[in-house]
Amino acid sequence: MSYANNNGSLSVPQYISTIDLTTETKPKFVKYFYYTVFNFAKQYTNPLILPFPITLEIIYHGDIDIGANLFSSKTFAVEEVSGSKFHISGQGTAYFWYRYGHIDPASFDLIAQTAISNKDWLVLDAILHTRSFIEAIDFLVNNPQTWTIIAEGLDWQLNEIGARDLFAYLTNNSYDTRKLAQFLTILAYIDPDVLVKVGIPVYTCDNPNKTFEKYLNYLPASPLVPIYSELSEQSSEISELFIQTSELSDDVLALMAQIVKIYYQLSEQQSEISELNIESLIHSSEITQLFFITSEQSFQISDLFTETSEIIFNLDQLSENLILFTNAGQIINNFLKMVHLFKAVLIILKILQHAVKTIAPVSELGILTDLGQLLDNILGMTSESIFYYTSELDIRGIIQTLVNLINQLLGINITLSSECCEEQEEKEKKKEKEKEKKKEKDDDDDQQNNNNNDQNGLGLGLGLNFGLNL
């Protein structure tokens, strides 16, 4: 169920309260089990606008115009109106009691006693507002265990009308004499039995102001004396506290001076820390630069290491090539020695040939003639073999191979020109022709010597011809 007004739609609660405790000073909905309680805050507006319709009890005297109702009474009386908006005007005095919700008397007593036992004052105040003002006051008077909480100011409507001061008076606590006299005046007209129950006389006059004066004179001033003595004691305590505060103020000032000194020291240390931070940043930058330089040098060292590895590898290859070159040189030397040996043998054979050819014509031994022919054959075969071997030997290829090997070893470029090779070939051809001419000449000389042996006698002619063409 909800109620719509100018402020919007509100859920209608089961109960209301006007509780005035410290934690309950604002209007709000409170869930109590499956019940909802709405607390009304203090409100003094005119017109009085409430969030939903309620029953409003008016405790008044004089002429009061509220809404469409006009009430008039020379003494205090109670009237009821219902609604959510009330415009109030007239002359006199009026107090309001909000009444809302319904609960049977048996349930009321049970819930009220449970709330008192549990000190659930919100529930107690809520069910009080289901009763009329007179019924609520009768319940409180009949239950002294509620007097203390009411005297502390549980309900702001009871506080405004003076009920709080009545229960403060009954519990020997401080109260407002004028407000208590006002409430006693109201009770004398609307519920005098309450005054009888608490032992206060009932005064009624035609004019409520005169009744108020009587109760004002009735109330003793004695309850105020303890208040004054208590205030005096509190004043002396306050004086002592003031002296202690003065003494402590000196200590506080000294501590303040120390704090200021420490603050300046901390400021100086903070400045030093800032400078150290700046220096650390500078050093950090330098370290970063050194790191980059070191990284570059590391890369350079790595490159140098790679180049060194390549050089070592090349040196290893050079060493192997030198060994090969040395072996090749030894082979060539051995070959040259063999060539020289063959040439020496050839010379010896030619000497023997000359000797035999010279001796054979004058000798009677036929074996010398055979020996001469054998030497001719051997010499011819040997010459042909040497010529064939030396002609088949690729001198230019050997030289080119040696040149390439030297290029690899020394890292230079040596080339054999074609002209040089052609010139070498021409020289070799000339030498071959000269050999052939010498051979023919030798044959002619041998023939001439054979023809002239009778005339010239025994003679030994030696002709040596040695040629090594590389």
UniProtKB/Swiss-Prot annotation:
Bias (Low complexity) ranges: 448-457
Keywords: Coiled coil
Coiled coil feature spans: 418-453
Annotated Basic and acidic residues bias: 426-441
Region feature (Disordered): 423-470
UniProt KW Coiled coil keyword: yes
The protein, known as: Uncharacterized protein ORF470
